[in-house]
From Swiss-Prot:
Any one GO cellular component localisation term in the record: ribosome
Subunit structure: Part of the 30S ribosomal subunit.
Stretch list, region Disordered: 67-91
GO biological-process terms attached to the record: translation
Organism this protein belongs to: Mesembryanthemum crystallinum
Cystine pairings recorded for this chain: none
Keywords, ordered alphabetically: Chloroplast, Plastid, Ribonucleoprotein, Ribosomal protein, Transit peptide
Annotated InterPro entries: Ribosomal_uS10, Ribosomal_uS10_CS, Ribosomal_uS10_dom, Ribosomal_uS10_dom_sf
Compartments where found: Plastid, Chloroplast
Protein name: Small ribosomal subunit protein uS10c
Pfam families reported for this sequence: Ribosomal_S10
NCBIfam families attached to this UniProt entry: PRK00596.1 (NF001861), rpsJ_bact (TIGR01049)
Family per similarity comment: Belongs to the universal ribosomal protein uS10 family.
Lineage: Eukaryota, Viridiplantae, Streptophyta, Embryophyta, Tracheophyta
SUPFAM superfamilies reported in the protein's UniProt record: Ribosomal protein S10 (SSF54999)
Length: 197
């Protein structure tokens, strides 16, 4: 039903002039893209108001075509669409950096890892690199259960735990100076550093 009515709407300007089913009797020479699209949109909006929002028509063109053509009276422009297809592609370069350094720090002691994070952030900021972090990752707890007694009395036990604290730092758009300053850092021995490029 919807397909046949849609084809009737699209091909109605092409109807023969002696047909009695169409009262307007349009001429084929007066047919233009703008008028047929506006008739189609008007008919669809009158037939079902609930589906009017889903019947948007978008026309896309290559940048060369847009620059070479001027907007004439027969060109169709959709109202209400402020976003451009070209603008979306241009922003994707700014969102995802081409190169980044991801530094993951692990330590059993919080003051050591905080001091190391501060040194890395200062070294990156002095070379004008953009930084993200330090992001505290979840602390991993390894619990060891040991019997107090060497032989019997299994009810009495010691519970030992080792907590591993983690931090994550991203350095976006690093330069050669940034990498040199990071290599010169003297971090404490109790901090495990993992670097990914």
């Amino acid at each position: 039903m919807a397909t046949s009515s849609l084809s009737t709407i699209v091909f109605s300007p092409l109807a023969l002039s002696n047909s009695s089913s169409f009262p307007n009797k349009p001429q084929v020479s007066n047919l233009s893209l703008h008028s047929s699209l506006s008739n189609l949109r008007r008919t669809l909006s009158h037939s079902s108001p609930s589906s009017s929002s889903s019947s948007n028509v978008r026309v896309f063109a290559a940048p060369e075509v847009l620059e070479s053509q001027e907007t004439g009276p027969e060109s169709y422009v959709e109202e209400g669409s402020e976003t451009s297809a070209l603008g979306i592609g241009a922003d994707s370069d700014q969102m995802a950096p081409k190169q980044k350094i991801r530094i993951k720090l692990r330590s059993y002691w919080v003051p050591l890892i905080e001091d190391s994070c501060k040194q890395i952030m200062d070294a990156a900021r002095t070379t004008n690199a953009k930084t993200m972090g330090p992001v505290p990752l979840p602390t991993k707890k390894r619990i060891f259960c040991v019997l107090k007694s060497p032989h019997v009395h299994k009810d009495a036990r010691f519970h030992f735990e080792i907590r591993t604290h983690q931090r994550l730092i991203d350095i976006l758009y690093p330069t050669a100076q940034t990498i040199d300053s990071l290599m010169q850092l003297d971090l404490p021995a109790g901090v495990d550093v993992e670097v990914k490029l």
